[in-house]
């Protein structure tokens, strides 16, 4: 009934915000043997997962009804990477970081495998974390990877 109410009563006060707790509750950040890569144990791209799980800021922490449905709803979410990747028919580059503390290897592989394009490439940046904090050499390697891929296809000169 709430979505119907929102459709009828549009305007600045139609949406009501709320906080979603526990959005970093992923056992992979505590146990590096689950979906293993080179990431640091007991760590996520936002810090200690036991702390950031209920911190004031986080992954989709503040929501409205519509944004929650888009991000978290099992049936209605538009945030399904592999399903969206099936619609990619143009050349695609997927860059994975081997110490990624935000996207594990299964994420990278599912996206890459789902891409429909016959021209798809997956490249790994050894030892790189999610945001490359304190890793200027890894960031440079990622930029060089993208630059080279674009130049190979004459997308960039």
Where in the sequence are the language-model features?
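Catalytic active-site module of serine/aspartate enzymes centered on a nucleophile-bearing elbow/loop
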Residues: 126-157
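Short, conserved loop/helix-junction motifs that constitute active-site signature segments
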Residues: 85-88, 114-117
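Hydrophobic anchor at the start of a short beta-strand
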Residues: 92, 120
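Short beta-strand/loop motif that positions the catalytic acidic residue
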Residues: 88, 94-96, 100
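Conserved alpha/beta-hydrolase "acid-adjacent" motif
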Residues: 77, 101-107
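Conserved beta-strand scaffold positions in the cores of enzyme catalytic domains, especially
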Residues: 122-124
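Alpha/beta-hydrolase
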Residues: 1-83, 90
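Short, surface-exposed alpha-helical segments at coil->helix boundaries
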Residues: 82, 105-109, 140
């Amino acid at each position: 009934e709430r979505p119907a109410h929102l459709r009828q009563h549009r305007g600045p006060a139609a949406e009501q915000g709320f906080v979603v707790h526990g959005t970093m509750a992923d056992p992979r950040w505590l146990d590096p043997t689950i979906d293993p890569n080179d990431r640091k144990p007991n760590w996520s791209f936002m810090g200690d997962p036991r702390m950031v799980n209920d911190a004031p800021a986080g992954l989709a922490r503040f929501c409205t009804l519509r944004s929650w449905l888009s991000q978290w709803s099992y049936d209605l979410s538009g945030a399904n990477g592999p399903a969206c990747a099936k619609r990619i028919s143009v050349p695609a580059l997927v860059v994975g970081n081997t110490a990624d503390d935000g996207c594990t290897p299964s994420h990278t592989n599912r996206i890459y495998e789902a891409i429909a394009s016959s021209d798809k490439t997956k490249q790994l940046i050894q030892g790189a974390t999610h945001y490359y904090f304190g890793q200027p050499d890894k960031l440079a390697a990622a930029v060089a990877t993208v630059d080279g891929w674009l130049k190979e296809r004459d997308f960039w000169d």
